[in-house]
Amino acid sequence: MSDRCPFRQILIRSRMFRLLPVLAVFSFASCTTVPELGGLVDRGGTSGRKIVVSLKSQRADLFHRGKLVATSPISSGREGKATPVGKFQVIEKDIDHLSSLYGNYVKGGKIVKENVDIRKGGRPAGSKFQGVPMPYFLRFNGAYGLHAGNIPGYPASSGCVRLPKRQAKRFYDAVRLGTPVVVQR
């Protein structure tokens, strides 16, 4: 670029070019995924709480400073819709969460198509999607979370970890953003 380029001359004169590296850093930083922001939220260090989910036993345990304070039966992801295994942290709390994928199509207050996955099939004309309620939702990985739901005694969910409503509320009330969640086989 020559010194005759008007854009370059404007940048040099206004000293805006000094801000470009800073702006670049901030624009890349905004692409960071939420779990990587762990330094900004509680990792269990200050609250001392941790959730451990056992897929084999279909059970979730809540620990406080290493001591078991609550346990609950669960229903994890069914075959083909497995709950992810690994170490995560609570990245969102939503007391009255609604599914954005699973629910019913409703028209005029009446269900016209029930138990749908919006990624499959079409929406009936004039209808609106109504997501399934997922009370006491604790998101720990992408679309996955712990929440109140049906507990049939075996893996039956679409990947989330369902708990009885009373226990879901207890876990919800006890944890903060950043609380570790360990999901093991």
Locate the predicted segments by residue.
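N-terminal secretory signal peptides that target proteins for export/translocation
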Residues: 1-13
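Exported/periplasmic cell-wall-interacting domains
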Residues: 3-5, 31, 35, 42-44, ...
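Bacterial N-terminal signal peptides
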Residues: 20-29
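Post-signal peptide N-terminal segment of mature Sec-exported envelope proteins
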Residues: 39-63
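Solvent-exposed coil/turn segments that connect beta secondary-structure elements
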Residues: 56-58, 65-68, 77-79, 93-96, ...
